[in-house]
């Protein structure tokens, strides 16, 4: 039986990124594979005709490449942390229907998927928690969820496309709280500069009726801007389109590589990595 998704619901906002990940898998098979997205799309009763039509446009295809690179970069950082902390907590912040935690599973880590209760309710139906995995309903801004994470073997926390919707002070408070709760842990997330965040905001601020885009989290130089938040933070960043992959694949045109350079250098689209001190 297929799971029906209605238009203009919270669930619909989860379906479109899922469709994007399926599109990435089809367009850039050598660069990205998300079998979960392909499988889930088949289980869902939803009118994808508009998404399918949009998928033919040049910018939609480049957007799919952006999604692919972001997910790959974050997964690379998760796997890299697990090499030295094999029993770590792998924490997907604002998980939606993303399965990166399970894709990085080494057979020993503990996987936590966090999102709002209505999102987790849908996830439980479509992606029920597996072995060593928990789906946790929460508000990321409320630190009560810290206590639900077993970080005795370390913690790698990651957020994909989440912090654009946070105020700068909310991200700072969350990062400082994580530094207390997860010493020796790492937080990895995507970010962009003010110009890019304003472009992202155009699509959702209208409906949210929020005027002050400037209060929302944006970063140009991660190390110099975020390090002063707390002396325990070790901040680094890489471009998220080409910082981990040169994109020299037949599926990626020269024009898309050119756009990727503009994204990384002009828009400062980046993967930010924050280490919370060292676990002795």
Roles of regions detected by a PLM:
Residues 143-152:
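Short amphipathic alpha-helix with an adjacent loop that forms part of the alpha/beta core around
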Residues 232-258:
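Conserved catalytic loop of SAM-dependent methyltransferase domains
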Residues 178-194:
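Conserved beta-strand signature within the Rossmann-like core of class I S-adenosyl-L-methionine
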Residues 213-240:
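Short alpha-helix
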Residues 198-213:
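Short, glycine-/aromatic-enriched active-site segment of Class I SAM-dependent methyltransferases
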